[in-house]
Each structure stands twice: as C-alpha cells, then as structure tokens.
Regions:
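General structural feature for long, well-ordered alpha-helical segments within catalytic domains
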Residues: 1, 9, 13, 17-21, ...
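Short secondary-structure transition/capping segments
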Residues: 19-32, 74, 81-87, 122-132
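Generic C-terminus detector
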Residues: 83-84, 89-135
Length: 135
C-alpha cells in the first residue's frame, strides 16, 4: 500500500486542517489514538493543476512561466525550475494553484480567475474541476 500524501490532493486538503498536524503524526507513529477529533477550518478550497502541453505524454521543458507572483492564493511548484532568474517548466505537472473562500462555488470561481493570471505558452489546465460538486 501507499502511506504518503497524494499529490495534488494534499495541497487542497491541508489548508483546511485546523488540528495540529505534528500531534496527528506523533499519535499515528506511536500507535496512539488522537486525544481530540480532527478540527477543520470552515471554508472551502479548490486546486487547479497547471500542466505542460502534451502531459501525460511527451512534453517540452524550459517554457518561461510568468504571473505566478500575481496569484491571490497558494501556488505550489511541482515541475518547475529556475533558469537565468526566471521560473520555467521542468515537468508534466508544473504547479497547482489553490484558493480558499467561504463556499465551494466561490473558491472555484476565485481559483479559475487566479489561474488566468498565469502566463505560459506551454501550459494547460482543466476547466471542469469542481463543476459536478456545485451542481
């Protein structure tokens, strides 16, 4: 079995965790039960992966990415590199943009807006993320 965090699920779930993650890890490692139930922040999160065109098949590397610093949300780098002071693509799943808001619909709207700030000729993202959940 696989005993690690999933990617990109972790980047979306962990911002909502209110409980102390070290306490959780310690209890699990020591075989103890948690003293308190897990607590979660009362907001929703959405994450949209930015992937290299061609992923999961063949894709080019080295395309310059701009606008990451303009995103109002968290940007987790997955397949990026620094080249001559600029961020470039270096993998298939390049980054994930995660946004939070009071409702799932608002988080989805915000995330799609923020993803639009990222500029790179060699990136694509899915536009159906979260749609089924808000219908």
């Amino acid at each position: 079995f696989n005993a690690r965090f999933g990617d990109p699920e972790t980047e979306v779930v962990l911002p909502r965790l209110k409980s102390d993650i070290v306490e959780i890890f310690s209890a699990v490692a020591d075989g103890w039960e948690l003293e308190h139930p897990l607590e979660w922040h009362d907001f929703s999160t959405v994450g949209v992966v930015l992937a290299s065109k061609g992923y999961p098949g063949n894709y080019a590397k080295g395309a310059v990415i701009e606008g990451l610093d303009e995103v109002d949300g968290a940007v987790y780098h997955m397949g990026t590199a620094s080249k001559e002071g600029r961020i470039v693509t270096a993998g298939g799943r390049v980054a994930i943009v995660v946004c939070a808001a009071p409702t799932l619909g608002e988080a989805l709207e915000k995330c799609n807006r923020e993803v639009g700030k990222v500029r790179c000729d060699n990136l694509f993202h899915r536009t159906d993320i979260g749609r089924k959940a808000i219908k």
